[in-house]
Amino acid sequence: MIISAASDYRAAAQRTLPPFLFHYIDGGAYAEYTLRRNVEDLSQVALRQRVLKNMSDLSLETTLFNETLSMPVALAPVGLCGMYARRGEVQAAAAADAKGIPFTLSTVSVCPIEEVAPTIQRPMWFQLYVLRDRGFMRNALERAKAAGCSTLVFTVDMPTPGARYRDAHSGMSGPNAAMRRYWQAVMHPKWAWDVGLNGRPHDLGNISAYLGKPTGLEDYIGWLANNFDPSISWKDLEWIREFWDGPMVIKGILDPEDARDAVRFGADGIVVSNHGGRQLDGVLSSARALPAIADAVKGDIAILADSGIRNGLDVVRMIALGADTVLLGRAYLYALATAGKAGVANLLDLVEKEMKVAMTLTGAKSISEISGDSLVQELGKSLPAALAPMSKGDAA
């Protein structure tokens, strides 16, 4: 098997994983238009090639929330990570730690906070959802703080689960889902042995520790469905500040006014994100949303971005559009499913090499030199031509 890009890991993961797991991470909401646009829009961002610039002292190092990162990349929070490789969160965290970048543990991880945090040298980040059960939220915040987590990533674009039609077809949900998942596991012996048998327990560690009992996949679906809170508002975030005094990042921002609200609230960062196209189909891609948000709050708050990033070139594009750092999600999960820690480590090496090539050929010696000037622009407009709003003729 030849691996030269994240797309190769995706193909390998599809062969390795039972369909219900592959399509759970690979799919999006509704007809998946936003899922596709995340990738397509970003791929159309054109960079300015510059030559004869003496790029011998190129550096990818950057600083975020008083942490030094070897490159402006962090691993995004991904639920059920431990179902994609044996104790998957531990393996992914180890790869990120070795690379010198942050790993973000999801609320709905298989491995609990207390299992992952002691295995790495640098502080990990912790992601928390807006949930009705405030007791759980407080418990999770206290445990994250006790484990030395440095940054809280608070996901706000999930007051209700998205409509993910692919899950019903794949066996993650829908009629006879448990039986369908069982037979899929039987037909994928590599996964069944490595994860199905030797990756136990398969409960959601952070939730189990709070409830005092194991939580399987059906429990996970039911517990989340009953606990997402559509009543959340900015006032609720003030409550969280009572229990968390470290950096707080608001994840799920697509509108400049919401970004300004995050600044007014006193958040330390935002993630420009549409949840990887998994929540509301038809919203802007992150690449389209990012420039206007950067115009509104750049310099007032740290800007992170995710959704659609598949390689190092995409990282450079996102930074040129206005991000300070990006989050990788699906790309690293494909690598994790294929080859565990080694797969994630190799993917991060590929991203680093791709970034160096892009920066060398655009004349940017450092991350701070990647800016809107790195983009090919249309008649002096601040928004790249490929991402400019469609005209009526284009829409037809």
Curated annotation (Swiss-Prot):
Name of the protein this chain belongs to: L-lactate dehydrogenase
Catalyzed reactions: (S)-lactate + A = pyruvate + AH2
Primary role: Catalyzes the conversion of L-lactate to pyruvate. Is coupled to the respiratory chain.
CDD domains linked: alpha_hydroxyacid_oxid_FMN
InterPro entries named in the record: Aldolase_TIM, Alpha-hydoxy_acid_DH_FMN, FMN-dep_DH, FMN_HAD, FMN_hydac_DH_AS, LldD
Sequence positions that bind FMN: 106, 127, 155, 251, 306-330
Residues at the active site: 275
Gene: lldD
Broad class of where this protein is predominantly found: membrane
Domain FMN hydroxy acid dehydrogenase: 1-380
Residues that bind substrate: 24, 129, 164, 278
Family annotation (SUPFAM superfamilies): FMN-linked oxidoreductases (SSF51395)
Originating organism: Salmonella paratyphi A (strain AKU_12601)
Record keyword Magnesium present: no
Keyword Cell membrane: yes
Family: Belongs to the FMN-dependent alpha-hydroxy acid dehydrogenase family.
Keywords, ordered alphabetically: Cell inner membrane, Cell membrane, Flavoprotein, FMN, Membrane, Oxidoreductase
EC class name: oxidoreductase
Required co-factors: FMN
Topology in membrane: Peripheral membrane protein
PANTHER family xrefs: L-LACTATE DEHYDROGENASE (PTHR10578:SF85), S -2-HYDROXY-ACID OXIDASE-RELATED (PTHR10578)
One GO BP annotation of this record: aerobic respiration
Source species, domain of life: Bacteria
GO molecular function: FMN binding; L-lactate dehydrogenase activity
E.C. numbers: 1.1.-.-
